[in-house]
């Protein structure tokens, strides 16, 4: 087996393994397959022969017969045939490779032209490689990369032209560069030193039109293919036989002397391939060998001709395959990429934190999925996306706000926003809002009520909240107060209801001496106690109607050893309220148990703090009564999520398993937050999450 090294036009190298007896076509096909190149006939593999001449690898000849030490030779993948019009190139990858070849020719000084033309071509290369103009980036890149032999004197012109290319894609820059290069005299020219019959030093070259004679960089004669009758070589003499012209008395055979026989033979082979590729309609067939010794070389061109390539491309048989352009580190300056490393590093660092945090046994929201802890976001840095997002939200606040937004302390951190928890005391569910409201929580609707009359209620702005589950303490209470997160604008005001009286009212054998309360003094405390008693009666009636029992006694859970940890959370930074004018907030209401979840493990863009420690810090018994007037209950059944039976709008279930419902996810798409729903649920909860009774007080969604 042979291990052969190939160097491509972007200076990358790859080693291919071929058989010992493989021909050059095997290595060439492997190289083109590595690039996913369809129009491969324009290219070839060049190497330095043992005589020191650069020659093309023959496709029909074994590699070992062309190269003495194949393992020590580097084959260069280069453009072999330059079409007269680069517009004939169908594929973007082909044009990109031609651009890389033009770039190499400019660096080697093979494309002499005026300073303006040279600077313009380099500016197109910079636009393709670096993108839009940025002075500091372009200046540093020109210092590190040599595009021209004398580049320092043209840097100002290059940068001046580069400023005019803002908004052009790399593919457009490639087309413009090739259009300029094709008009140059030395486009696609590989001159070979020679001398004429009089001993004058000249250069010979071959192009799509025929054989050229040059003196320096100036063409002094052109022999078109139509005029040439035969091309041959004898030792180091190259012979051109022309068609006889009766009108003009001239020689029909021209002889040129080249440096060596190998150089002369290599140039002759190149002329044969150029003539076949540009002039023939199909690949020439091999000549049958005679029994007797035949005179002359049997070399021929192998591959599709240009006409076949064009016809093949017109029929749409060439498949465009994706490719990757060479990237330069200098094209990403600080302003463009400072957020990307931050986000990626946060994702990798927080995967374990997410698993540990969501694996806790006592911190769970109403859907059985663990809510995020404050420690998760405390170690996370704010990326540039969040900085921009916070700044935009600060300037896009709605005109009518229920509360005032406190200014943030820094541009890179979010401010947290609070609102008062409002307990709905209406005994009937409220009407469904006809108009769309921004970022509203799950709202009730009379359309799904079971023959219940509904009263018109003034529309109030609803905000999204998350209600994690917290186990009860040793106090004999029915319902524990959830840990509430509010995305509104001011610190919460603790409701001044007597929690001790609430506890007494929840007990069936409790007795409250109302005679001790003076009826003449109507204090707010007495009014709240009376309202509390009414709420308790309504709660018992509603629970009796739904469960079919007159008395409901919920046994208290065992004392949780982690209860102290639940009260030990500290307030984090404040998060901004989303503006009503944002285009991505298009949902009227959130589905039951909806929450923001990203498409994969990624840093959260919002932070939440717990209101539990702030609200009940001074209370001895952390209990509160929850109004059940406007709630919706989903009955757990064996059917799918979409077939869950709705008993009453906005009613929560007390027994059994809660049904799963679609959750809202965040998809980062162009700096905006798009909410979409999906049916599948991704839970980081412990295995016992589904077996626990979940409480969902709906009135905590109202603010």
From Swiss-Prot:
The gene is Frmd7. One of its GO terms (cellular component) is neuron projection. Keywords: Cell projection, Coiled coil, Neurogenesis. The keyword Coiled coil applies. Plays a role in neurite development, may be through the activation of the GTPase RAC1. Plays a role in the control of eye movement and gaze stability. It holds the Pfam family FERM_N. Residues 2-282 form the FERM domain. It comes from the Eukaryota. Its main location: other. Gene3D superfamilies: 1.20.80.10, Phosphatidylinositol 3-kinase Catalytic Subunit, Chain A, domain 1, Pleckstrin-homology domain (PH domain)/Phosphotyrosine-binding domain (PTB). The keyword Coiled coil applies. SUPFAM superfamilies: PH domain-like (SSF50729), Second domain of FERM (SSF47031), Ubiquitin-like (SSF54236). In the developing cerebral cortex, strong expression is observed in the ventricular and intermediate zones at 13 and 17 dpc. At 17 dpc and P0, expression appears to be restricted to the cortical plate. In neonates, highly expressed in cortex, hippocampus, cerebellum, olfactory bulb and eye with little or no expression in liver, kidney, skeletal muscle or heart muscle (at protein level). This is FERM domain-containing protein 7. Residues 525-552 form a coiled coil. It is found in: Cell projection, Neuron projection; Cell projection, Growth cone. SMART domains: B41, FA, FERM_C. Induction: Up-regulated during retinoic acid-induced differentiation of neuroblastoma cells. GO terms for biological process: negative regulation of stress fiber assembly; nervous system development; positive regulation of lamellipodium assembly; positive regulation of small GTPase mediated signal transduction; regulation of neuron projection development. InterPro entries: Band_41_domain (IPR019749), FA (IPR014847), FARP1/FARP2/FRMD7_FERM_C (IPR041788), FERM/acyl-CoA-bd_prot_sf (IPR014352), FERM_2 (IPR035963), FERM_central (IPR019748), FERM_CS (IPR019747), FERM_domain (IPR000299).
């Amino acid at each position: 087996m042979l291990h052969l090294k190939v160097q491509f036009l972007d200076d990358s190298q790859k080693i291919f393994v071929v058989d010992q007896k493989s021909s050059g076509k095997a290595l060439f096909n492997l190289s083109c397959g590595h690039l996913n190149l369809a129009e491969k006939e324009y290219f070839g593999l060049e190497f330095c022969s043992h005589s020191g001449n650069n020659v093309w690898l023959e496709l029909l000849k074994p590699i070992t017969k062309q190269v003495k030490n194949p393992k020590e030779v580097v084959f260069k993948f280069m453009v072999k045939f330059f079409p007269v019009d680069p517009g004939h190139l169908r594929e973007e990858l082909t044009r990109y490779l031609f651009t890389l070849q033009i770039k190499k020719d400019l660096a080697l000084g093979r494309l002499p032209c005026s300073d303006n033309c040279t600077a313009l071509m380099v500016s197109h290369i910079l636009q393709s490689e670096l993108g839009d103009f940025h002075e500091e980036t372009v200046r540093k890149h020109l210092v590190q990369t040599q595009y021209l032999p004398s580049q320092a004197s043209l840097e100002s012109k290059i940068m001046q032209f580069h400023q005019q290319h803002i908004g052009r894609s790399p593919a457009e820059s490639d087309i413009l560069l090739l259009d300029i290069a094709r008009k140059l005299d030395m486009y696609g020219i590989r001159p070979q030193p020679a001398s004429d019959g009089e001993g004058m030093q000249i250069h010979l070259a071959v192009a799509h039109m025929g054989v050229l004679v040059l003196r320096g960089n100036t063409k002094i004669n052109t022999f078109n293919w139509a005029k040439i009758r035969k091309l041959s070589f004898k030792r180091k003499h190259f012979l051109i036989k022309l068609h006889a012209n009766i009108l003009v008395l001239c020689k029909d055979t021209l002889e040129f002397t080249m440096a060596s026989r190998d150089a002369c033979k290599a140039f002759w082979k190149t002329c044969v391939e150029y003539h076949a590729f540009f002039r023939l309609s199909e690949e020439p067939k091999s000549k049958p060998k005679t029994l007797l010794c035949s005179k002359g070389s049997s070399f021929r061109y192998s591959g599709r001709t240009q006409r076949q390539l064009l016809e093949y491309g017109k029929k749409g048989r060439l498949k465009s395959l994706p490719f990757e352009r060479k990237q330069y580190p200098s094209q990403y300056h600080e302003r463009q990429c400072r957020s990307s490393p931050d986000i990626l590093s946060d994702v990798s660092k927080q995967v374990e934190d997410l698993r540990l945090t969501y694996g806790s046994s006592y911190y769970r929201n109403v859907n059985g999925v663990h809510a995020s802890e404050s420690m998760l976001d405390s170690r996370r840095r704010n990326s540039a996306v969040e900085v921009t997002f916070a700044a935009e939200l600060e300037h896009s606040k709605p005109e009518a706000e229920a509360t005032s937004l406190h200014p943030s302390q820094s541009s890179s951190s979010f401010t947290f926003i609070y609102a008062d928890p409002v307990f709905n005391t209406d005994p009937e569910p409220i009407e469904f809002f006809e108009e769309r409201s921004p970022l509203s929580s799950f709202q009730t609707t009379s359309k799904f009520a079971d023959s219940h009359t509904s009263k018109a209620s003034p529309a109030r702005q609803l905000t999204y909240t998350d209600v994690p589950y917290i186990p009860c303490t040793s106090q004999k209470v029915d319902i524990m107060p959830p840990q509430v997160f509010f995305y509104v604008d001011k610190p919460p005001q603790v409701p001044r209801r007597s929690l001790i009286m609430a506890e007494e009212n929840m007990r069936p054998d409790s007795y409250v001496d109302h005679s001790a309360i003076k009826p003449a003094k109507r204090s707010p405390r007495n009014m709240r106690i009376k309202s509390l008693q009414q709420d308790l009666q309504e709660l018992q009636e509603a629970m009796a109607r739904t469960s079919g029992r007159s008395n409901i006694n919920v046994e208290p859970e065992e004392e949780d050893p982690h209860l102290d940890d639940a009260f030990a959370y500290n307030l984090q930074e404040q998060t901004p309220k989303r503006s009503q004018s944002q285009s991505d907030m298009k949902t009227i209401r959130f589905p039951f148990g909806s929450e923001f979840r990203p498409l994969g493990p990624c840093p959260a863009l919002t932070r939440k703090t717990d209101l539990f420690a702030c609200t009940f810090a001074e209370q001895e018994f952390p209990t509160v009564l929850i109004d059940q007037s406007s709630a919706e209950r989903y009955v757990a059944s064996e059917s799918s999520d979409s077939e869950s039976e709705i008993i009453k709008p906005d009613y929560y279930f007390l027994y059994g398993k809660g049904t799963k419902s679609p959750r809202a996810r965040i998809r980062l798409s162009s700096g905006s937050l798009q909410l979409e729903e999906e049916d599948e649920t991704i839970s980081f909860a412990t295995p016992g999450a589904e077996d626990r009774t979940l409480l969902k007080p709906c009135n905590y969604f109202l603010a």
